[in-house]
């Protein structure tokens, strides 16, 4: 199969040969959903904290005697049943949100994403992608000439000027093939891959 070549003026050029094993697979929506959710979960860190009955600052004195008042028995005001008491199952920063995804499943999911991008015309090959200086304006003007506004660039050799120029653009990311993740692939409207990076992707996902 072939991936379309995108020229600097935004025009589509000749096709570039690509492996059907990576870019020609059927779309598995359930698997893609699973690896995207797992990626988000594994990037999550615990930042919630609630107190249980041991941590709430309350007196441990018994509110009233056990029997004879007609009220329900109570041990202390830090009980989760009381207003201002501790939580029964409090959230903690030590919570583990990670989800395990087997390597075989992950590679199959990534192949499914790349294949769907190719079918939708959202992935194109470029001869190379570089800027002369680490200037955001140079890169922004280049994208404007190509008619792009939301771009993930997958390059075989991460150019420092390109990386620095892209950091201040909100809808642009630059990564190497081994760092391409499922969330970024489905998030950006257009994915640009250098010719050498296509071979690296095929090697990673074979």
Curated annotation (Swiss-Prot):
Biased composition (Basic residues): 59-70
Compositionally skewed regions (Basic and acidic residues) per UniProt: 49-58
The keyword Ribosomal protein belongs to this UniProt entry's keyword annotation: yes
The entry's keywords: Ribonucleoprotein, Ribosomal protein, RNA-binding, rRNA-binding
GO BP terms in the entry: translation
Annotated InterPro entries: Ribosomal_uL4 (IPR002136), Ribosomal_uL4-like (IPR013005), Ribosomal_uL4_dom_sf (IPR023574)
GO cellular component term of the entry, any: ribonucleoprotein complex
Region called Disordered, residue ranges: 43-78
Alphabetized GO MF terms: rRNA binding; structural constituent of ribosome
Role this protein plays: One of the primary rRNA binding proteins, this protein initially binds near the 5'-end of the 23S rRNA. It is important during the early stages of 50S assembly. It makes multiple contacts with different domains of the 23S rRNA in the assembled 50S subunit and ribosome. Forms part of the polypeptide exit tunnel.
NCBIfam families: rplD_bact
Protein family according to the UniProt entry: Belongs to the universal ribosomal protein uL4 family.
Alphabetical list of HAMAP family matching this protein: Ribosomal_uL4_B
Known partners and oligomeric status: Part of the 50S ribosomal subunit.
Protein name: Large ribosomal subunit protein uL4
Native organism: Cupriavidus metallidurans (strain ATCC 43123 / DSM 2839 / NBRC 102507 / CH34)
Lineage, top ranks: Bacteria, Pseudomonadati, Pseudomonadota, Betaproteobacteria, Burkholderiales
